[in-house]
Amino acid sequence: MTSSQKIMKKKGRFKAEIDRRLPKAQSDALWQMATERLAVLQEQYSSLPEGLRFHTENKIFPAAAIYLTLKESIGQSEAYRVMENATFKTADAAAKKLKALLRLPGMRSLFVKAWDPLTRKMFGENSGFQNVFYPNKKGEYRMDVVSCPYNRYFTELGCPELTKISCGADDHVYGDLPGLKFERTSTLGRGGKRCDFCIRKV
């Protein structure tokens, strides 16, 4: 199994959304085309650093490959709905697991504290982001993203509208967690100059 096939195998919710709309033969053919498109992108961007490739290979390039392939066949509007529905269903599933975890004693405080080291490692300069980090306050974490590889590479690949979906996924994951409030006033994907991120205990 190739690298692109392994990645696409993990995108079952996207395939299911396509299957709901199209005959199986057509869905399977488009999925194969998207897989091949992903392989091309992997080769084209093979020199990207490891931290950045975590985002491009697991999220950005598969989404672009699926969306652009669908767009050519079923049109932009329907392709966008497929991507939005599958992404938000994935985010909702993550939120459900997170809610269960946060109901355990002490987990809300630990969750907030974990964000500083987590974002610096996974969403810092080594992963293609540019950030403004704010001083830590008890029970609160704040950070701004002023440059984002999702916005950059989706735009470069001709599908900047997908960035908005990625921004929306955060709202689905963090927007209704027990004992925590997620605050955001703007995102790069929605035309803002930054993605401001604040999560705090309430």
Task: Give a label for each model feature.
Residues M1-L70:
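N-terminal, charged low-complexity regulatory/assembly segments
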Residues I18, L70, M122, D170-V173, ...:
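Hydrophobic, Leu/Ile/Phe/Ala-enriched alpha-helical segments that form helix-helix packing faces
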Residues Q26, E78, K181-F182:
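Secondary-structure boundary/capping signal
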Residues M33, F129-V132, F182:
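Generic structural motif
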Residues N58, P62, E78, L162-S166:
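Short amphipathic alpha-helical segments
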Residues T69-L157:
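Amphipathic interaction/junction segments at domain boundaries or subunit interfaces
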Residues G139-R142, C148-V202:
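C-terminal non-catalytic interaction appendages of large macromolecular assemblies
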